[in-house]
């Protein structure tokens, strides 16, 4: 099992698919990485040489923000919005949907379990 960016990637999968197990690398970035390292798209992780794994690590470290660094960056951005007091920051602070979704009904995932109100029946 190869370890890239602090993640154990599965050995029996194709390299393009296995790289997507790293937070911050999707289909497009995985395809770009194997193109830069010049690895065939149908190659499996178990067939990679140590040199190829090292090249993949170097490309990811140099060109991409992944795993903990990416999570930290996103957290800092959200905190910045909350400190500014802008609308998006207020929505984050209140635990409500940020991108304009309705909240009269739905939005239960973001708002948490329904709170019952005593004496409210039809």
Curated annotation (Swiss-Prot):
Entry GO MF terms: rRNA binding; structural constituent of ribosome; tRNA binding
Record keywords: Ribonucleoprotein, Ribosomal protein, RNA-binding, rRNA-binding, tRNA-binding
GO cellular component: cytosol; small ribosomal subunit
Pfam families recorded: Ribosomal_S13 (PF00416)
Protein's GO biological process: translation
Segments for region (Disordered): 95-122
Record PANTHER family: 30S RIBOSOMAL PROTEIN S13/40S RIBOSOMAL PROTEIN S18 (PTHR10871), SMALL RIBOSOMAL SUBUNIT PROTEIN US13M (PTHR10871:SF1)
Subunit text: Part of the 30S ribosomal subunit. Forms a loose heterodimer with protein S19. Forms two bridges to the 50S subunit in the 70S ribosome.
Family according to the record: Belongs to the universal ribosomal protein uS13 family.
Job description of the protein: Located at the top of the head of the 30S subunit, it contacts several helices of the 16S rRNA. In the 70S ribosome it contacts the 23S rRNA (bridge B1a) and protein L5 of the 50S subunit (bridge B1b), connecting the 2 subunits; these bridges are implicated in subunit movement. Contacts the tRNAs in the A and P-sites.
HAMAP family linked to this entry: Ribosomal_uS13
Name assigned to this protein: Small ribosomal subunit protein uS13
Gene for this chain: rpsM
């Amino acid at each position: 099992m190869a370890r890239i960016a602090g993640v154990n990637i599965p050995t029996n999968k194709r390299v393009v698919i296995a790289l997507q197990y790293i937070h911050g690398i999707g289909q497009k970035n995985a395809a770009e990485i194997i193109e830069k390292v010049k690895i065939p798209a149908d190659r499996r992780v178990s067939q990679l040489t140590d040199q190829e794994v090292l090249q993949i690590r170097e490309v990811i470290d140099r060109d991409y923000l992944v795993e903990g660094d990416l999570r930290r960056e996103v957290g800092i951005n959200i905190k910045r919005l909350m400190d500014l007091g802008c609308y998006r920051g207020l929505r984050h602070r209140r635990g409500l949907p940020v991108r304009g979704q309705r909240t009269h009904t739905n939005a239960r995932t973001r708002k948490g379990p329904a709170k019952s109100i005593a004496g409210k029946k039809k």
